[in-house]
């Protein structure tokens, strides 16, 4: 069987801009980009708010089938207009934008045919959980801001009803989440049943008004906000729970693989291409790549076990790591302090590895309580455009959050991982707006995993256990290639996936369960990490070999990050251009 090739064949289209640069082509391209964003913001007010566009802050998106069809028709028009523009007449930077826009819109169309909107949630998030964060993105600063925010709260029942109607359509079509993972979602939905407005995160802007809002308006706005949550938000969550428990769970499918859905094999094949950003990637190739990486990393892990002089089998060593109290924080504050300390230690090394650093800061916060039980160990939240980023650390079930993986988690989610990457992208100048938040998963998650590896060179790992933790995180991502394709393409059961992760990683039993349920609910996404990291490592080795003593690690990293989020084929061409300078 063929292992997925890490080298990507260079496209026949020249990377450099054509000497026959056309201002008309550039004008047409910029107009197309502007019209696409304007349409997207109008159709998705939450994205508009996050992008700093406040024209639609008083409403939530429409997600009806008619709205979905409107999006498809618009994307077909956008793609047709793009293909009519002579790419060869563009500058090198505009060619990057052209290629990324092509990927973004064509992939939206490829996935739209599978009508994913019929299942608008996964194991740890979804429409019901996402809206509970909208107060942070909205961040109202004036009386008018608050009034628009209140109107958006009052629109929530309509938004929930449309999503419920879409889920009912999925039930009729056999396009549902698997019944086997719904218990965890049920716990999240139960935690979203608020007894009074003050218990709801969406009330927080009314608890503390900024000084920019006149004090004379505070009481009126607080009363209106409380009323909106009491009359609109709380009943909407109650109706959703009733629907989820009484209708959805009893009728959810009893298979777990995406390939078991109607049209599922074509659907999963499209997801593999989308999440890897590789047009020729196949599930079988990805699976074989995963098996090869698991074997390689296992040998490195076993070498550390021997170095420690542990008397026992590999499985017994994993049990020791999962159960010995020395490896776990005693309080949430201890875990958060450890994470914050690691971020500052990394900060001291950043100038030696990166020439360009972002202006935007980030903070360390616990995962919100209502999400934590079914959430991953940590995640990065970029926040609203212009605001600080957030490194979320999960403080739920501390005996399942080993400290020996905390350096890897921090490198991945904060710096030099997602915060560095995302903040630099948002600070790009003279690029179309869509690129500021563009996130091709293989590049984004591949960079996060590469950052964990870079931590070795930065001196972040101080003990053999932390080195083992780094390897277990890498092994975890290699296992994802095997497990995700196993369940969604090769017919694996959930138990097979659980057993495979338990046998090969030092993740806690709780983390293994939440991870497998995430892969089941979000098919294909787990492939992005290792495929992207392998490409970045391969490109670095290529640059080191080609440049020899002229290789500069800071310049290489800047070249990788200077265009924000890119597909792996675009990244390869950019690194080839870096080598040729």
How should these model regions be labeled?
Residues 5-16:
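Bacterial N-terminal signal peptides
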């Amino acid at each position: 069987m063929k292992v997925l090739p890490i080298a990507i064949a260079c496209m026949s289209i020249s990377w450099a801009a054509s000497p026959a640069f056309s201002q008309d082509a550039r004008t047409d391209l910029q107009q197309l980009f502007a019209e696409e964003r304007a349409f997207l913001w109008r159709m998705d007010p939450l994205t508009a708010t996050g992008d700093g566009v406040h024209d639609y802050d008083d409403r939530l998106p429409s997600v009806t089938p008619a709205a979905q069809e409107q999006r498809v028709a618009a994307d077909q028009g956008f793609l047709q207009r793009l293909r009519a523009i002579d790419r060869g007449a563009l500058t090198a930077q505009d060619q990057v934008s052209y290629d990324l826009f092509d990927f973004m819109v064509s992939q939206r169309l490829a996935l739209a045919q599978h009508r994913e909107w019929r299942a608008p949630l996964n194991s740890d998030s979804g429409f019901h959980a996402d809206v509970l964060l909208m107060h942070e993105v909205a961040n109202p600063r004036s009386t008018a801001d608050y009034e628009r925010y209140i109107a958006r709260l009052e629109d929530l029942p309509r938004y929930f009803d449309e999503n419920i109607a879409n889920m009912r359509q999925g039930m009729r079509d056999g396009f549902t989440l698997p019944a086997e993972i719904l218990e965890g979602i049920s716990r999240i939905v139960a935690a979203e049943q608020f007894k009074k407005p003050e218990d709801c995160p969406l009330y927080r802007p009314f608890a503390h008004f900024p000084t920019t809002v006149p004090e004379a308006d505070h009481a009126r706005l607080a009363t209106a906000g409380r009323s909106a949550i009491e009359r609109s938000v709380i009943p909407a969550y109650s109706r959703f729970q009733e629907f989820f428990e009484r209708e959805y769970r009893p009728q959810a499918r009893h298979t777990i693989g995406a390939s078991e859905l109607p049209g599922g094999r074509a659907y999963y094949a499209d997801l593999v291409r989308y999440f890897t950003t590789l047009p020729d990637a196949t599930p079988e190739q990805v699976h074989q790549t995963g098996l090869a990486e698991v074997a390689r990393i296992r040998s490195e892990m076993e070498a550390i076990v021997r170095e420690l002089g542990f008397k026992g089998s590999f499985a017994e060593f994993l049990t020791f790591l999962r159960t010995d109290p020395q490896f776990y924080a005693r309080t949430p504050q201890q875990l958060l302090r450890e994470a914050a300390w690691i971020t500052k230690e990394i900060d001291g090394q950043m100038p030696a590895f990166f020439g360009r650093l972002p202006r935007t800061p980030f903070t360390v916060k616990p995962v919100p309580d209502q999400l934590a039980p079914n959430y991953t160990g940590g995640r990065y939240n970029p926040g609203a455009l212009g605001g600080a980023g957030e490194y979320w650390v999960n403080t739920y079930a501390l005996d399942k959050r080993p400290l020996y993986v905390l350096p890897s988690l921090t490198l991945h989610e904060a710096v030099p991982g997602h915060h560095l990457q995302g903040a630099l992208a948002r600070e790009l100048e003279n690029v179309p707006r869509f690129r500021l938040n563009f996130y091709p998963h293989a590049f984004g998650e591949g960079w996060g995993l590469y950052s964990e590896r870079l931590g070795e060179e930065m001196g972040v790992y101080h003990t053999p256990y932390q080195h083992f933790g780094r390897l277990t995180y890498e092994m975890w991502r290699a296992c994802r290639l095997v497990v995700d394709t196993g369940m969604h393409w090769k017919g694996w059961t959930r138990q097979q996936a659980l057993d495979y992760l338990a046998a090969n990683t030092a993740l806690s039993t709780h983390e293994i369960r939440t991870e497998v349920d995430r892969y089941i609910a979000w098919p294909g996404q787990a492939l992005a990490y290792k495929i992207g990291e392998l490409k970045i490592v391969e490109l670095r080795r290529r640059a080191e070999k080609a440049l020899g003593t002229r290789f500069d690690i800071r310049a290489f990293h800047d070249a990788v990050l200077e265009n924000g989020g890119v597909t792996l084929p675009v990244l390869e061409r950019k690194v080839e251009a870096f080598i040729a300078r």
